[in-house]
């Protein structure tokens, strides 16, 4: 494959074509038109921090590199967004927020703003757990809520309070 393509150094824009790695190692196959035309890459290994495992969805924009420039040895090194509309709304425009969100809508938000920051877990059905400097809040997404602030436990927005 590389004999007729030459060496390819640097990052190339690609699009995920297949993310179902039969070896379950986090590999993807991508379309990289500037290198392969309409063909997909071979299985591209992930380049990610130790302990981190996330696979981009089919159709997602990914950066592709090649080990020692060899097109037979693709590596996917991260994702790119075509526009701000593709970004998760929980992130914009605050750089002090880190959001991990699945395509199914489950998320973990880490917010480092002093005084208002914290950790919030959401699932796709609307249940929430929020841990902040002010306290802990639990919600079932259907109206029931528990808030723990200082020595007070509040149920359903103050319908019952225990101190």
Question: What is each PLM-predicted segment?
Answer:
Residues 1-147:
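Hydrophobic packing positions characteristic
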């Amino acid at each position: 494959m590389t004999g007729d393509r030459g060496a390819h150094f640097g990052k190339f824009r690609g699009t995920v074509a297949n993310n179902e790695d039969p070896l379950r190692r986090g590999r993807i196959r991508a379309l990289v038109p500037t290198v392969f035309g309409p063909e997909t890459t071979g299985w591209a290994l992930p380049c990610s921090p130790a302990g981190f495992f996330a696979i981009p969805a089919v159709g997602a924009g990914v950066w592709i590199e090649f080990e020692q420039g060899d097109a037979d040895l693709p590596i996917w090194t991260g994702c790119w967004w075509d526009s701000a509309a593709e970004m998760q709304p929980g992130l914009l425009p605050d750089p002090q927020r880190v959001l991990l969100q699945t395509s199914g809508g489950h998320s973990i938000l880490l917010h480092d703003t002093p005084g208002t920051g914290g950790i919030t877990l959401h699932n796709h059905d609307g249940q929430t757990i929020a841990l902040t400097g002010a306290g802990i809040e639990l919600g079932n997404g259907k109206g029931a809520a528990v808030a723990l602030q200082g020595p007070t436990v509040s149920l359903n927005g103050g319908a019952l309070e225990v101190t």
